[in-house]
């Protein structure tokens, strides 16, 4: 396999069918989630390096948070864009294995990797770098939920599940929430009214 064939094979990932049998996603969600993941990984690595440099201020927790954030950035970059690690053979097979998993697995992994650096060293660098990875996980989670039904399907489901069973919908002006409700009576004031 030539270098060009390998590169085009790695770049064609978002067009492939979902091998896990999940719902079909629109093209902008497939490519958008990949691009968001790549951008998130880049900024996580960059701001993780910034947190690692905080060892100058003797902040060990920020050092560890920066290392974890950089590792999370490398993992996200390897899973979203394995073409960036083309010299490492196992990255492609790991990315292929991850593509066979359901989308909620990837969403959970990204969200779980993004949380520890934020709690260990709360600051703009860890919040922005890990927050983008968390946002990528949230997008994958929403993709895992799938698209909602059409308006006609939701309307039909609401009519079937309405209270009262198979009652046909009424178009009467006086139709209320409660069936067989009597109108209010305007007979006058109550006898015990003091008229104050």
UniProtKB/Swiss-Prot annotation:
Membrane topology of this protein: Multi-pass membrane protein
Locations listed in the record: Cell membrane; Cytoplasmic vesicle, Secretory vesicle, Synaptic vesicle membrane; Presynaptic cell membrane; Endosome
Top-level taxon in the UniProt lineage: Eukaryota
Pfam families: Cg6151-P (PF10233)
Site feature (Calcium ion selectivity) residues: 80
Signal peptide bounds: none
Coiled-coil residues: none
Single GO MF descriptor: identical protein binding
GO CC terms of this entry: cell projection; endosome; presynaptic membrane; synaptic vesicle membrane
Residue pairs linked by disulfide bridges in the UniProt entry: none
Transmembrane parts of this sequence: 36-56, 67-89, 114-134
Subunit: Homomultimer. Associates with the dally/ magu complex.
Name under which the protein is recorded: Calcium channel flower
Organism expressing this protein natively: Drosophila virilis
Lineage: Eukaryota, Metazoa, Ecdysozoa, Arthropoda, Hexapoda
């Amino acid at each position: 396999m030539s270098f060009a064939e390998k590169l085009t094979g790695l770049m064609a990932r978002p067009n492939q069918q979902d091998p896990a049998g999940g719902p079909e996603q629109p093209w902008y969600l497939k490519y958008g989630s990949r691009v968001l993941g790549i951008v998130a990984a880049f900024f996580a690595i960059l701001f993780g390096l910034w947190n690692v440099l905080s060892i100058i201020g003797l902040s060990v927790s920020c050092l560890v948070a920066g290392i974890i954030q950089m590792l999370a950035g490398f993992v996200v970059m390897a899973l979203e864009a394995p073409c960036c690690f083309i010299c490492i053979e196992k990255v492609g097979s790991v990315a292929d294995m991850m593509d066979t998993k359901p989308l909620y697995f990837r969403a959970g992994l990204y969200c779980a990797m993004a949380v520890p650096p934020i709690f260990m060293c709360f600051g703009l660098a860890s919040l922005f770098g890990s927050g983008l990875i968390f946002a990528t996980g949230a997008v994958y989670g929403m993709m895992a939920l799938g698209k909602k039904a059409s308006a006609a399907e939701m309307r039909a489901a609401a009519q079937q599940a309405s209270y009262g069973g198979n009652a046909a919908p009424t178009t009467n002006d006086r139709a209320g929430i409660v069936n067989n409700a009597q109108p209010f009576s305007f007979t006058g004031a109550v006898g015990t009214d003091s008229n104050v």
